[in-house]
A protein has these predicted regions:
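NAD(P)-binding Rossmann-fold cofactor-contacting core
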Residues: 149-170
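Extreme N-terminal segment that seeds HTH/winged-HTH DNA-binding domains in transcriptional regulators
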Residues: 15-72
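HTH-adjacent hinge/linker in prokaryotic transcriptional regulators
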Residues: 73, 77, 82-127
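Hydrophobic/small residue at the entry helix of a nucleotide-binding pocket
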Residues: 136
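Glycine-rich Rossmann-fold phosphate-binding loop(s) that bind the pyrophosphate
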Residues: 133
């Protein structure tokens, strides 16, 4: 278990954790294909884009903040203005899944939040396994925000003998990677997070797939090969930094895609 972290390390862990939360919604959507589905959208749920899924996750966070402020209702316009979103896009995204607004009132914050959690598959606790007990894996394991959003970090896995049998600061146990298949089956792990070096990522993802996990969040650079029924989302921090670098260099022409 690592020692004390610097302020920069804490900030990095927080930013990585935010990226983790932002991407999990699409993985939950993939998991729902083989399990219990949320309320049916007006069209085939398999055709919902990843950008739409990500926006629903953003709306959910905004509603959570509004609820904490004591708000009971909100219009798409006020939601957009307060959180720097697009009102027309909000209405379009929500209309895809049904009619949630009330004429003259807008949206009931608590009800819309509940519907979004159902749509995103977050109305039940999901168990997550982290592969790789290095600094990144440990930082993710100890982030308390995951549990608040319904994601339980069930275990970590590593192949270094000195780490096996240890725990993260928050008490997440570290198991031998050889026990992955047995643990996934016994503890119903739904999502795997890869926090391993790029050189071993494909070998590790093969083990994860063989264990029966259908949703994977990959923090290793590069592209992984998986079967068609397995969803992988990559979080490449270097790409994000390069995008910010482009914005700084060309701020007058840089535009957000979504």
């Amino acid at each position: 278990v690592p020692g004390r972290e610097s302020g920069a390390e804490v900030a990095m862990a927080r930013d990585i954790s935010m990226a983790f939360c932002y991407n999990l919604a699409a993985l939950v959507k993939q998991r729902n294909k083989a399990g219990v589905r949320p309320p049916k959208p007006r069209q085939n749920a398999d055709h919902v884009s990843e950008l739409t899924t990500n926006r629903l996750s953003v709306y959910l966070r905004c509603l959570t903040e509004l609820e904490a402020q004591g708000a009971r209702t909100v219009s798409s316009q006020s939601l957009a203005e307060q959180f720097h979103l697009n009102a027309a896009q909000i209405r379009k995204d929500l209309a895809y899944f049904g009619e949630f607004g009330v004429r003259g009132v807008g949206y009931y914050v608590r009800d819309l939040k509940r519907h979004l959690r159902q749509i995103l598959g977050l109305d039940r606790r999901l168990r997550v396994g982290i592969i790789g007990a290095g600094n990144l894996g440990l930082a993710l394991a100890d982030y308390q925000g995951f549990r608040q959003e319904g994601f339980e970090i069930a275990a970590m896995f590593d192949n270094q003998v000195g780490k096996v049998g240890q725990q993260s600061r928050s008490g997440v146990p570290i198991y031998d990677i050889a026990e992955l298949r047995k643990f996934v089956k016994r503890d119903a792990v739904s999502i795997a997070v890869l926090a391993v070096p790029a050189g071993s990522a494909q070998k590790v993802v093969d083990m994860v797939v063989a264990a029966g996990v259908k949703a994977i969040l990959n923090f290793s650079p590069g592209t992984l090969q998986v079967p068609d029924d397995v969803k992988v989302k990559g979080v490449d921090l270097t790409v994000s930094l390069e995008s910010l670098s482009f914005y700084l260099a060309h701020g007058d022409i840089a535009q957000d895609d979504d």
